[in-house]
A protein has these predicted regions:
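Juxta-kinase regulatory segment immediately upstream of eukaryotic protein kinase catalytic domains
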Residues: 2-43
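An alpha-helical support segment within catalytic cores of ATP-dependent transferases
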Residues: 23-36, 154-217
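ATP-binding glycine-rich loop module of kinase domains
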Residues: 50-77
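Conserved HxN/HPN-centered segment at the entrance to the catalytic loop
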Residues: 84-99
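Short pocket-lining segment of the protein kinase catalytic domain that shapes the ATP-binding cleft
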Residues: 104-113
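Conserved kinase catalytic-core helix
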Residues: 115-165, 199-211, 218
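Conserved catalytic-loop position in the HRD/HxD motif
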Residues: 221, 226, 235
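Active-site activation/catalytic loop segments of kinase-like enzymes and analogous catalytic loops
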Residues: 245-322, 338-353
């Protein structure tokens, strides 16, 4: 760890680093042993692709812990320091530094339980039938964004770039450059569209140029697992001054489609202790038919986009909030949304039906988003199939 970061932690986070002069294997037995020496017992531990986290207890008091590699730790701490005084977040209590990673202990959030407390849980609970008046909860979350987005600056560099510009080479080009079927013309519900490769080329060209964008202080990864309905926010690796268009495209994709269908299906480990979401996957499975003509190099897809009334209500409130603040969102919104559709998961590795569903969504949004972005998005989501 750099001396600058160490000094920043002592000054801004106000915790002392406890240093271990060896590498942590990040295996369950060793993690339990390390935390036991510090007086903690593990209540549960969750191993994910990019991180390990869980809940521990000491003297009948719970804490949330994360184990992060050195660069991820640096991003998390920097983001946390940037928003901790203006956003509702849980305080960091202790940090253990190893040669290859760090363990961060956060105060435990008592409003989060099994299948309760997160925006994800609220949406899942109301997906099938709105059981209570949800407006108060939705407005509570949206009003926080409204207050945050009132103060803006224009920037061309921002933390959320790692989800957009930084994934052009590492994901968009790497994953799809050799996909022959993406060079086929696409017809969706009887309407001619472009080749998927042509849309991808537009996305690459857009992010190849520098754009000064309207930015506001934000958590930076607004998916439904990172937002508590209290409200409270988690995960700070991309927190800081981010473009509102980035925040909007991320939460639009997360709320309406990804966290209802794709994410629980292709990254189920994220939903540890929030597993009710799995019961609704079939509900959001599209009624999709497709035909690939290799001779004419054409793809015909007939489909709908499934979501729920509560998810549409949330996004409509979000759009209304942006309009009331006079936030300018242009047609380039589709390029940010395309990066969410194509670069969270490699769609080429999905089941075939989901592969073509992803292509359908991309083309449907591309064809229907107009210069009046807010109006066209409201029209688009009003045509989604409510299940």
């Amino acid at each position: 760890m750099s001396l600058n970061l160490e000094h920043l932690i002592k000054e801004k986070v106000n915790v002392e680093l406890k240093k271990y002069n060896y590498q942590c294997k990040k295996e369950e037995q060793e993690i339990r042993s390390i935390l036991k020496k510090e007086g903690y017992s593990i209540k549960y531990i969750n191993f994910q692709n990019n991180s390990t986290n869980g809940v521990i207890e000491k003297n009948n008091k719970k804490f949330f812990f994360k184990i992060l590699g050195n660069q991820d730790f640096s991003n998390e701490i920097t983001g946390y320091i940037g928003i901790k005084d203006k956003f509702p977040v849980n305080k960091i209590k202790e940090i253990y530094e190893f040669q290859n990673c760090c363990i961060i202990l956060y105060e435990y959030e008592n409003t989060i339980h099994n299948n309760k407390g997160l925006l994800n849980d609220f949406l899942v609970q109301n997906d099938n039938e709105i059981k209570e008046n949800p407006k108060q909860i939705i407005k509570r979350i949206i009003s926080f964004y409204s207050n945050s987005f009132k103060m803006t600056i224009n920037n061309s560099q921002y933390p959320m770039q790692q989800f957009y510009q930084d994934r052009i080479e590492s994901r968009l080009i790497k994953w799809y450059n050799k996909e022959k079927i993406l060079k086929y013309k696409v017809n969706i519900n009887g309407v001619e569209s472009k080749k998927t490769s042509e849309i991808i080329k537009e996305v690459i060209n857009f992010f190849d140029k520098e754009h000064k964008l309207e930015c506001s202080l934000s958590q930076g990864d607004p998916n439904t697992l990172n937002i508590g309905i209290k409200p409270i926010f988690f995960d700070f690796a991309t927190s800081g001054y981010n473009p509102i268009i980035c925040e909007f495209s991320a939460i639009f994709w997360s709320v309406l489609i990804a966290d209802a269908y794709f994410c629980p299906k292709y990254h189920p480990k994220s939903y540890y202790n929030h597993k009710k979401v799995f019961k609704n996957i079939d509900k959001f499975t599209p009624n999709l038919q497709y035909e690939v003509n290799d001779t004419e190099k054409k793809i015909n897809i007939q489909s709908n986009i499934k979501t729920s009334e509560i998810r549409i209500d949330f996004i409509k409130e979000y759009i209304e909030m942006l309009e009331n603040l006079n936030v300018k969102i242009g047609k380039e919104f589709i390029y940010f949304l395309a990066m969410r559709i194509l670069c969270i998961f490699n769609i080429s590795k999905m089941k075939e039906k989901d592969y073509f569903y992803s292509i359908f969504i991309l083309h449907y949004m591309y064809k229907n988003i107009s210069d009046d972005v807010y109006d066209s998005l409201n029209t688009i989501i009003s045509k989604f199939e409510i299940t």
